[in-house]
From Swiss-Prot:
Keywords: Cytoplasm, RNA-binding. The lineage of its organism: Bacteria, Bacillati, Cyanobacteriota, Cyanophyceae, Oscillatoriophycideae. Coiled coil: none annotated. It is found in: Cytoplasm. Gene3D superfamilies: 2.40.280.10. It comes from Gloeothece citriformis (strain PCC 7424). Belongs to the SmpB family. This is SsrA-binding protein.
C-alpha cells in the first residue's frame, strides 16, 4: 500500500487475522459496493473479523464481512449487512490464487480496508492457519518485547 498513486486513508484493520494466520502474500482488490454501504464505511461501521474470501466460477467473493446498515436511509433502500460482495482482481491474480488455494490448502483473509483516492480497497492476504504453539510463541515474544521496552525505559 504505497502513497505514490494517491492518498490512502485506513478504514479498518483486521488485527486478529495476523494473530490467527501466517500471512504469505497480500493483494490489493477493489470491491463492488452499493451507495449505502459506502456511506456506512465512511462512518467506520464495518467489521472484517469474521470475513474470508472465496474464488467461485473464476470470480473472487468477499463473504461474511459485516457492514452495518446506513442509519440515515430507510429500511427499504438499505443493504443486507452480511451480503456476499464481489472483489475486483486481475485475471492473472485470480488464476494464481486459485492454484494456491486449491493445491496448498491456503485461505484468503481480508486484512484491512482503506480508501485509495475515492475508491474503497481491500487488502487480502493469502494465509496459512497457525497452530496453537505458534500462537503461544507469538504471545510470549510480544510479552518479552514489552518487558524489554519497560526495562529500557527505566534506564
Amino acid at each position: 500500500m504505497s502513497n505514490q498513486n494517491g492518498k490512502t486513508k485506513l478504514i479498518t484493520d483486521n488485527r486478529q487475522a495476523r494473530f490467527l494466520y501466517e500471512i504469505l502474500e497480500t493483494y490489493e482488490a477493489g470491491i463492488e459496493l452499493t451507495g449505502t454501504e459506502v456511506k456506512s464505511i465512511r462512518a467506520g461501521r464495518i467489521n472484517l473479523k469474521d470475513g474470508y474470501a472465496l474464488i467461485r466460477n473464476g470470480e473472487a467473493w468477499l463473504i461474511n464481512v459485516h457492514i452495518s446498515p446506513y442509519e440515515a436511509s430507510g429500511q427499504y433502500f438499505n443493504h443486507d449487512p452480511r451480503r456476499t460482495r464481489k472483489l475486483l482482481l486481475h485475471r492473472k491474480e485470480i488464476n494464481k490464487l486459485i492454484g494456491q488455494v486449491e493445491q496448498k490448502g491456503l485461505t484468503l483473509v481480508p486484512l484491512k480496508m482503506y480508501f485509495k483516492d475515492s475508491w474503497v480497497k481491500v487488502s487480502i492476504g493469502l494465509a496459512q492457519g497457525k497452530k496453537l504453539h505458534d500462537k503461544r510463541e507469538t504471545l510470549k515474544r510480544r510479552q518479552d518485547e514489552r518487558d524489554m521496552q519497560r526495562a529500557m525505559k527505566r534506564w
